[in-house]
A protein has these predicted regions:
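C-terminal boundary/linker of central alpha/beta nucleotide-binding cores
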Residues: 44-121, 132
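Extended alpha-helical scaffolding segments used for macromolecular assembly and cargo binding
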Residues: 128-207
Length: 207
């Protein structure tokens, strides 16, 4: 069965030009007669061929960094506390393993299929490991003034003191985009003892 023009366009878009992604998409197409969507088993196929064979520590590295849309070597070192990040990224990009270095020569990005599979693998980590990485992401983004990203990471980790600290630092500038229900959720779930430590943050949230 040949692909239609619309299917070819879909394949090009979903594969982002990665040969391995094209191959996995076509394998799925040969079995079902349809190109895979987000609900298909192509992600299981991808994980089985690209993630599962890796050593656990390498798999965890990819799982953790899959949370970021883009990242630098410095960021990956901070998030994972690994000293061999340079070697890992060099190996992955050399093998064309769904990780690419952008034109600036410093920023890396996962293919969307790798990112989705990495996130699925991340959710299988112990709660303590997930909490560790969310805390590291929050700290990185907070340090670099990316307060919306920091807030998102801290919320996933339920670190309410860090949430209010970020709100107080931002003074409502970037976080003005928060929906009212999100603000109420933070206030309702935050322990009173923590709220008392950050009165200025409460004023910012109640604007």
């Amino acid at each position: 069965t040949s692909l239609t023009d619309s299917q070819l366009e879909q394949l090009l878009k979903s594969s982002e030009g990665w040969f391995a992604a094209v191959y996995l998409n076509l394998c799925s197409f040969s079995k079902s007669g349809e190109l895979p969507g987000k609900t298909s088993d192509i992600y299981q196929m991808f994980s089985a061929s690209m993630l599962n064979p890796l050593p656990e520590d390498r798999k965890e590295f990819l799982s953790a960094m899959g949370l970021a849309d883009e990242f630098t070597e410095e960021m990956a070192e901070f998030i994972t506390k690994r000293e061999d990040v340079h070697q890992i990224l060099k190996m992955l990009t050399r093998q064309n393993a769904f990780v690419t270095c952008l034109n600036d020569g410093q920023t890396y990005r996962f293919h969307h299929m790798m990112k989705e599979c990495a996130f699925r693998a991340f959710r299988t980590l112990d709660d303590s490991r997930q909490a560790f990485y969310y805390e590291r992401y929050g700290a990185w983004y907070e340090k670099h003034g990316a307060y919306i990203h920091a807030l998102s990471a801290y919320r996933r980790n339920q670190n309410f003191a860090a949430i209010l600290r970020v709100v107080q630092k931002d003074a409502g500038i970037l976080l003005a985009s928060l929906k009212p229900e999100e603000v109420l959720e933070v206030l309702n779930r935050c322990p009173v003892s923590v709220l008392k430590e950050y009165p200025l943050a409460i004023l910012v949230l109640m604007r």
